[in-house]
Amino acid sequence: MESLQNHFLIAMPSLDDTFFERTVIYLCEHDEKGAMGLVINKPLGIEVNSLLEQMDLPAEQVSTDLALGAQVLMGGPVSQDRGFVLHTSQPYWANSTELSSGLMLTTSRDVLTAIGSERSPEKFIVALGYAGWSKNQLEQELADNSWLTIPADQALLFDVKHEDRWQQASRALGFDAWQLSSQAGHA
């Protein structure tokens, strides 16, 4: 099995699931036990500063309102009360797990409270919940043509507007996702 960690899953236009329709998922883990990822294009309508207030977490000395005004994303349907921060690498985040060169994941509160301060990760995504697959489940969904995959790209992850990520991800494959047939065949 080839690991798809550090890849994007792009929902096929034919994917008939109200949660996953037109989603782009960053795969944080993928091994023989299953897979875990974060949906990166479904804002919850909550800003990071509001989330910090709801959690009674004091923000450090804020140097930019832009970071605290970032949207919290709906990371997936599993454990929606659990927060994840996907962020660019910083040397002082011991509780963050390195996923790839330059990208880390944490559930630690210290990164959340540092957002917007001098210690803030340069780029980040805050998400509630995650998408999870049991052993061989993702492989079956790929065989069923539910998803397309491409290597992850930090520009798409952090610099493209949420509402444009699905379209941009499909264009990275060289076509517009809407040009695909909703019917899949197997030869």
Curated annotation (Swiss-Prot):
It comes from the Bacteria. Transmembrane segments: none annotated. SUPFAM superfamilies: VC0467-like. One of its GO terms (cellular component) is cytosol. Belongs to the UPF0301 (AlgH) family. This is UPF0301 protein Shewana3_1200. It comes from Shewanella sp. (strain ANA-3).
